[in-house]
Structure formats: C-alpha cells, structure tokens
C-alpha cells in the first residue's frame, strides 16, 4: 500500500519557521513524520530549522526556506508544477508579510558596519527604535526594501534543491543502525554541507543583494541623504564595477561553514538530550517532542547566529575602501572593537520574524483549503 502524503500541520510549520535566516537565512530542515505520514523533505536555510522525530540523514540544507514540495519523480508533472508554483506564491506571501521585521533585523545586525561607512548617524536603541526611525526617515514602504531579491531567490533555490537532492542522498547514504552513529552523523553533516554549498553557489549573490538593499539607509545625517543603490540591478552593477565577481560572494566560505556548524549543533543536541528527557510517558508525546525540538532549534540557531553576523558584515564591505581580510579577521575585529554582544545583534528580531512568517503560512493554508479544496506546496518565510 502506498504511503499517504499529508502536509505538515500548523504546529510543525511554526517550529520550522521559528529562528529561520539564517545563520538567511539562514540550516532549516524538513519535518519528517513516521511511517505512513512520511514526507519527502526538501532543503532549507541553514540558520534555523524545523525538528524531526527523529532527525534523519534525509535532511539536507541550503539557503532556501523549508518548502514541502515533492520532486517530479514522486508525483505527476502537473501536480508537481502546481505544487512548485503554489509553493512560490506561499513563499512570496510569507516573505513579504515578514519583510518589515526582516529588514529591521538586518539593520540592527549590520548597524556598526553602516556607522563605520558613514551611512548611519547613530546606533539603534532596539527593535522599536529601528522601526520608528526607518519609517520616519524613509517612509512606511521602505520596510520592504530588499524583499524582491528575497522572493526571487525561492525559485532557483527550489530547482537546485531538486537537482542536488538525489545525488547527495545516494552519495552519503549512511544508516544509523547499519553504519553506526558517528558515520551516520558525519555523513549527515557532509550531505547537508555539500547540498547547501552547491545551491548556495548559484543563489548567494541574491542574498548579498538583498542584504545590501535592506541596509541601504536613506538618511544617515540630519537633512537626509541619498541611497547608495537604486535597486536590485544597481547593486549588481556597482558591486561588479568596484569589486568584480568576488564582491558578490564575500562571506560565501563562512556561510558554507555555518551550514555544517548548525547541523552539527542541532543533531548533536537532539540525539544527546532526547534519550534523557523523552522517557516514559513523554516518549510518544507530540507536545513534549515539539517543545524539545523548539528549544533545540533555538539553541542551535542562537549558537550559530554569530556566523550569520560575520558573513553579513563581510557582505557590507563590498565596494568599501577597507575590507576584512577573511572571516576570521572579521570575527576578531568585531570582538575586539565592539564586543561579543555585537555578534548577536538582531537575534530578537529574527525570532519575531520567524513567528510572523509561521502565522502567515497558517492563514495561507486555510485560504488554499477554502479556494482550492486542498493544500499545495508551502513556502517558508
């Protein structure tokens, strides 16, 4: 009998959305149900993750949001195309809804780099202050600056996920019960890192452009000031002119490292804590597993958040006179000049953004049921 495929519940999506971009965005992993509810998981953004019961080697990470869409081989082409398209619409809706919080997160995270470049007059005092100043200086619509690049990124990322999924699944096909925990664990990190880096290679420049646009504050000083970039195409044009291709990929190496670091923390924590806490009546409890996955997702996300900060701070130096020599140099300079706290700036807004995205996805699923009578692929925020 063929296993029945069902879409993830609202609770599962909420867990997957919480602490997403990032390290932008950013390891997300798919939620996998046991037995007849098993779902083929696609890759996600490495800064955050949904949880699994238990985590398996089928989870591969890239910079995409967690989107539950099956490959053409797993379903008819027409249904696949509908799933892919509706997943894109869902991604666009959820990303657009959460875009204001996303921009605030990026502004707070990169404000020290902006101040050094003379593009911000004084630091933000918090999330509320950042919202208020941005709306006052640039207008309400500016909260969505950079969102176009973020939405566009969904489609090539999903296509690349399908292309790399089967290859790396076969290449690192280790089983925990057959090959042992450590070989399975290493294979999981390798497959996630390889798949993530492969997809990231093609879409990284869009993440770079999104970051630069979001951090392009209009009024750095009293009296206002012009923007550095006029739009997405202008980011590419100016970066290529001043720094060449390398400018579009600044921070790429540390981004790949972030995929492996996040997955290592996530799997390591889950496998270590689950046997200790989920015992007796809690062993088969959905809510207990949900809570554990939620806590571990946040723990791994916060622990790897400094990597996201370093890579984005490196992005901000493209086109500038002074650049970091490497990711290690960036890390050392930030610690020396700004303190460890600076590595976690924007983490609070990141959590809010994920919660907002999860809420929008839940509502969008309900809308699909009303309009189409069924749910199609869902895009993450």
Curated annotation (Swiss-Prot):
Subcellular location: Mitochondrion inner membrane
Entry domain remark: The transmembrane helices are not perpendicular to the plane of the membrane, but cross the membrane at an angle. At least 2 of the odd-numbered transmembrane helices exhibit a sharp kink, due to the presence of a conserved proline residue.
Motif Nucleotide carrier signature motif per record, residues: 311-316
Chain positions covered by the region annotation Important for transport activity: 311-316
Gene3D superfamilies given in the database record: Mitochondrial carrier domain
Segments crossing the lipid bilayer: 80-107, 148-172, 181-201, 252-273, 287-307, 347-367
The protein's name in its UniProt record: ADP,ATP carrier protein 1, mitochondrial
Membrane topology, as annotated: Multi-pass membrane protein
